[in-house]
Curated annotation (Swiss-Prot):
Pathway annotation from the record: Alkene biosynthesis; ethylene biosynthesis via S-adenosyl-L-methionine; ethylene from S-adenosyl-L-methionine: step 2/2
Name of the protein in question: 1-aminocyclopropane-1-carboxylate oxidase 2
Chain ranges passing through the membrane: none
Known catalytic reactions: 1-aminocyclopropane-1-carboxylate + L-ascorbate + O2 = ethene + L-dehydroascorbate + hydrogen cyanide + CO2 + 2 H2O
Species classification: Eukaryota, Viridiplantae, Streptophyta, Embryophyta, Tracheophyta
Family: Belongs to the iron/ascorbate-dependent oxidoreductase family.
Length: 325
């Protein structure tokens, strides 16, 4: 399928007469693609340029040589490489909420720390704006999705960023940049390299490239939104294909529920399905951290068994007697 059919949403169109068409595109993207790309999303080009510059410089100064040493050892024993248990990527993680760890990440200079904090603030605002647009599309009360995400004991979502580089790979037929998976969380916002491609999603049994567009933010639906919408929105398999040329930058930020937030299908959506006599199976109810504990072990496996495991846990918990003393 041509990349031109990939859903690209100009957020400026949400302000005027073309809003209905833009909202229809958003709905189609969430229901049938699990991915879309945003233009004119409110994050300045100047800030995105700084984010790209500080992260590429950080990789060059502190991580490139380490990765070359890892790659050399890996390729020297290529006959022993298990491609199902290896990703060709260099990564580090930043946590923003409920508490930040940016000051503790080694080798980050003050400019990089300040830039990434500023970027995180802008992404948080964009994620919350998107959640309200999704509420509008779903017919849910404004703020519903954010309240679910912030429904844990600290009243905050979990929000963090994975900073990745995918260096040139001499054996892309053997090793994936990142193996196929769905994302466990809520809504994912990706600032990707606009010069080196590699991100692909699975649609209709075909791997489709997510087009690298300058100054865009790629958004994808995580497993938790699939549960909350009772399957109306879908998280989809995606992967990164290793490239022989170029170093691909990927900065993915995950706006997820709080660790002890309880996730369950929105009652209003379940009731609407019942009224319309849609006989859909209802997704399970669980604590987000319980799902994450399973996901950590099963990330690169199908999502459906994870949902079934949560459903089994829900049945066991509901069958236990309630303490009276």
């Amino acid at each position: 399928m041509e990349s031109g059919s990939f859903p690209v949403i100009n957020m400026e169109l949400l302000q005027g007469s073309q809003r209905p068409a833009a909202m229809a595109l958003l709905r189609d993207a969430c229901e049938n693609w699990g991915f879309f790309e945003l233009l004119n999303h409110g994050i300045s080009h100047e800030l995105m340029n700084r984010v790209e510059a500080v992260n590429k410089e950080h990789y060059r100064r502190f991580r490139e040589q380490r990765f070359k040493e890892f790659a050399s050892k890996t390729l020297d024993s290529v006959e022993n490489v298990d491609p199902d248990n290896l990703d060709w990527e260099s990564t580090f993680f930043l946590r923003h909420l409920p508490t930040s760890n940016i000051s503790q990440i080694p080798d980050l200079d003050d400019d990089c720390r300040a830039t990434m904090k500023e970027f995180a603030r802008e992404l948080e605002k964009l994620a919350e704006r998107l959640l309200d647009l999704l509420c509008e599309d779903l017919g849910l009360e404004k703020g519903y999705l954010k309240r679910v995400f912030c429904g844990g004991s600290d009243g905050l979502p979990t929000f963090g960023t994975k900073v990745s580089n995918y260096p040139p790979c001499p054996k892309p037929d053997l090793i994936k940049g990142l193996r196929a998976h769905t994302d466990a969380g809520g809504i994912i916002l990706l600032f990707q390299d606009d010069k080196v491609s590699g991100l692909q999603l699975l649609k209709d049994r075909e791997w489709i490239e997510v087009p690298p567009l300058r100054y865009s933010i790629v958004v994808n639906i995580g497993d938790q939104l699939e549960v909350i919408t009772n399957g109306k929105y879908k998280s989809v398999l995606h992967r990164v294909v290793a490239q022989t040329d170029g170093n691909r930058m990927s900065i993915a930020s995950f706006y997820n529920p709080g660790s002890d937030a309880v996730i369950f299908p929105a009652p209003a959506l379940v009731e609407k399905e019942a009224e319309e006599e849609e006989k859909k199976e209802i997704y399970p109810k669980f604590v987000f951290q319980d799902y994450m504990n399973l996901y950590i072990r099963k990330k690169f496996e199908a999502k459906e068994p994870r949902f079934e495991a949560m459903k089994s846990m829900e049945i066991v918990m509901s069958s236990q007697p309630i303490p009276t003393a």
